A protein has these predicted regions:
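Conserved ABC ATPase "signature" region
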Residues: 111-128
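Helix-to-loop junction immediately C-terminal to a conserved catalytic motif
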Residues: 49
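H-loop/switch region of ABC-family ATPase nucleotide-binding domains
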Residues: 200-201
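ABC ATPase nucleotide-binding domains
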Residues: 232-233, 237-261
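Catalytic Walker B motif of ABC-type/P-loop ATPase nucleotide-binding domains
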Residues: 159-160, 165-169
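Conserved ABC transporter NBD signature motif
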Residues: 56-65
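The feature captures the beta-strand-to-loop junction immediately N-terminal to the Walker
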Residues: 34-36
Length: 261
């Protein structure tokens, strides 16, 4: 199955924010969304998540327009991790992650009591479970919110369905080690059938882990396809205005590496 969009055009204050004639993203794959600041990446992610009510009919999940989805059913099928996740009250980490389980209140998982810890473990943040959220570092907060969205789409064994994670810069606040830990986790989730769309700014990080990259520019998808085909110096210079060269990399997948001047 897939997450699709048709004639996705979003205009606000006479400014075209999105103009995407057609888009089809397969589940079970890691899709990296790249592009310069202001290209429309976060706007597209929000539209695909159902946050832009004017284009709900143009986006389909499991073959159904988002406008036809029940709110709780949609929350169980997809989770959005925005760039900013303000928490106005003094919650502890367990409380934050437990919020992701709210859509499942009417059909709790057999392991419901353990899912918060399971999600924190996957996000590399279990040791923070009893900490006050406001005392965490930026990177620790990012991993806690990643655990929250993991908990949100945790599938019920009696109600299996396609699941999607829509992540806006999930690695931005993380150190080098945690960036790669999170990207490996996302790859593992795709092997379980989860569809992942991640906005990234590190082109080499996208090239190392993504199955497909989508390069946006001025509200449009400039180029999309396999990493080794799309991430070429000519595209980087045209879209970002940065000169680079592609270095060979002899791994099992034959992925290359971009070196910047």
């Amino acid at each position: 199955m897939s997450l699709t969009a048709q004639d996705l055009r979003l205009v606000k204050s006479q400014r075209t924010l999105l103009d995407i004639p057609q888009l089809q993203l397969a589940a079970g794959r890691l899709h990296a969304l790249l592009g310069p600041n202001g290209a429309g990446k976060s706007t597209l992610l929000g539209a695909l998540a159902g946050l832009e009510h004017s284009v709900l009919r143009q986006v389909r999940l499991l073959g159904q327009p988002l406008s036809h989805w029940d709110t709780l059913d949609l929350a169980r099928a997809r989770a959005l991790l925005p760039q900013d996740n303000p928490v106005p009250f003094d919650f502890n980490v367990r409380d934050i992650v437990r919020m992701g389980r709210y859509p499942h209140s009417d059909q709790p998982h057999p392991r419901e009591a353990h899912l918060v810890d399971d999600a924190l473990q996957m996000a590399g943040a279990l040791h923070l479970v009893h900490q006050r959220y406001e005392l965490l570092s930026g990177g620790e907060k990012a991993r806690v919110h990643l655990a929250r969205v993991l908990a949100q789409v945790w599938a019920h064994p009696d109600h299996p369905q396609e699941r999607w994670l829509l992540l806006d810069e999930p690695t931005a606040a993380l150190d080098l080690a945690h960036q790669h830990t999170v990207m490996r986790l996302l790859r593992e989730l795709t092997q379980q059938g989860v569809g992942v769309i991640a906005v990234l700014h590190d082109i080499n990080l996208a090239g190392a882990y993504a199955d497909q990259v989508l390069v946006m520019n001025q509200g449009r998808i400039d180029t999309m396809g396999a990493c080794e085909q799309v991430l070429q110096p000519s595209l980087v210079e045209r879209v970002w205005g940065v000169v680079c060269e592609r270095l060979p990399r002899h791994d099992r997948e034959g992925r290359g590496w971009l070196a910047f001047s």
